[in-house]
């Protein structure tokens, strides 16, 4: 199905973006955020989404660090808080459901296991669409078959047969980006973390309460149950295994794989597996990071997971999407030359991305120990870390580093002074 929503722009800025046509591939989080700032700075963005409608499935995600400032500048911070899941924290539990460690939202200054702002991915996608739909052209149910970069434009051939010319093309289409595969020479930039993860929704139970519960079973298996704000519960199943391309199986095969892997896991896993059978929002992926020497080629650049996925383990994917989109739009508005704009975008973002992608060695083994002894030791350690005095000390030690991570340029004032 091919459909289009086309609206006129409401903002116009006197800068190098004025009247430029920019194709953004991907209507998740990074793409619409970029579209918002591009149209605000004077461009004509077009957001292209392969799915016939918004993809509103997904688990709870959070916004951290300077990402919060970006949503404030978009004037959607209040809406995000209103639609947040209201999770109170995460409890590490054993097979009997007993809490071994607990981290409230306030732990680590609101930047811990559960951040101050937690929202369902689908809710956030809807908020961004609502914020941009009146000023941005959206095309659903189509995708690029070819992207040909010319000296003064990019010609894109769509699966629908349409051919259009753009000044710039931005790939914001996720870790397995089609844009990246069409344009960039590095065909294998994904560094696998040897862990698989599945997300889906199950019926709510009174035992779910308002806290997430995280359970580990031997064999590197994890079961996470998270309450949402829609009267249901979000389940997450993950297991450690060397990369075997399970993400390429069809959904029924992936569900059967999980039934087999978690059959004897214990805790409330039988209930989760029962809900898995009828889950219609099932999503399965191999965890990995995207690492490229360069995020642009000619008039095409990458944004968010497509260019620098940090993986869910980092907890920084959504934040990188917001910050990257803001900086990319700002630098494109400052520089008439797209090469210089992309260079500055990368110069500002790459140090932050490098920090976000730094995962503690052995972090997957810590998150999902292989043995009962390993699980017990890890839970004991987390029980000690969860003590208020310890979390307070860790917060003080890391707070200064957090502040230094990224400083957002004030592009509104910069453009006003040009």
Predicted regions and their residues:
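FAD/FMN-dependent oxidoreductases across multiple families
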Residues: 205, 218-219, 228-233, 239-314, ...
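Conserved N-terminal glycine-rich FAD pyrophosphate-binding loop of Rossmann-like flavoproteins
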Residues: 53-69
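A structural signal for isolated positions on well-ordered beta-strands in alpha/beta enzyme cores
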Residues: 23, 46, 137, 234-236
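Mid-domain catalytic core of redox enzymes
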Residues: 160, 209-221
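Short beta-strand micro-motifs enriched in acidic
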Residues: 149-150, 226-228
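C-terminal helical "tail/cap" subdomain of flavin- and related membrane-associated enzymes
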Residues: 2-20, 82, 97, 296, ...
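Conserved mid-domain beta->alpha element of the FAD-binding
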Residues: 23-52, 170-171, 198, 257, ...
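Conserved N-terminal helical subregion
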Residues: 7, 11-22, 39-41, 64-201, ...
């Amino acid at each position: 199905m091919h459909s289009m929503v086309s609206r006129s722009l409401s903002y116009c800025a006197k800068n190098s973006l004025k009247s430029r046509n920019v194709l953004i591939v991907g209507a998740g989080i990074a793409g619409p955020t970029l579209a918002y700032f591009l149209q605000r700075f004077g461009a004509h963005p077009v957001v292209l989404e392969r799915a016939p409608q918004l993809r509103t499935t997904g688990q709870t995600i959070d916004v951290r660090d300077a990402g919060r400032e970006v949503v404030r500048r978009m004037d959607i911070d209040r809406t995000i808080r209103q639609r947040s899941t209201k999770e109170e924290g995460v409890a590490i539990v054993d097979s009997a459901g007993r809490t071994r460690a607990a981290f409230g939202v306030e732990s680590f200054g609101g930047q811990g296991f559960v951040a101050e702002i937690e929202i369902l991915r689908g809710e956030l996608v809807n908020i961004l669409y609502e914020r941009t739909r009146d000023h941005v052209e959206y095309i659903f149910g189509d995708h690029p078959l070819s992207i040909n970069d010319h000296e003064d434009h990019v010609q894109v051939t769509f699966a629908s047969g349409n051919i259009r010319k753009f000044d710039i093309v931005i790939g914001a289409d996720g870790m397995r980006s089609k844009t990246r595969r069409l344009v960039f020479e590095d065909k294998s930039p994904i560094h696998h973390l040897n862990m698989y993860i599945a997300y889906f929704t199950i019926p709510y139970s009174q035992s779910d309460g308002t806290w997430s519960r995280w359970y580990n079973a031997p064999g590197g298996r994890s079961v996470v149950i998270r309450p949402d704000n829609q009267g249901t519960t979000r389940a997450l199943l993950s297991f450690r295994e060397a990369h075997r391309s399970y993400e390429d199986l069809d959904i029924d095969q992936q569900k059967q794989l999980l039934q087999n892997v978690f059959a004897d896991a214990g805790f409330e896993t039988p209930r989760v597996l029962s809900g898995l059978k009828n889950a219609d929002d099932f999503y399965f992926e191999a965890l990995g990071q995207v690492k490229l020497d360069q995020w642009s080629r000619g008039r095409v650049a990458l944004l968010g997971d497509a260019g620098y996925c940090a993986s869910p383990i980092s907890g920084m994917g959504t934040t990188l999407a917001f910050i990257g989109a803001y900086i990319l739009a700002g630098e494109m508005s400052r520089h008439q030359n797209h090469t210089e704009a992309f260079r500055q975008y990368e110069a500002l973002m790459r140090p932050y991305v490098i920090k976000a992608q730094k995962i503690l060695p052995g972090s997957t083994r810590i998150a999902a120990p292989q043995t009962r002894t390993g699980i017990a030791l890890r839970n004991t350690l987390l029980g000690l870390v969860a003590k208020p005095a310890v979390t307070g000390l860790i917060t003080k030690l890391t707070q200064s580093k957090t502040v230094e991570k990224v400083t957002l340029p004030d592009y509104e004032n910069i453009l006003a002074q040009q």
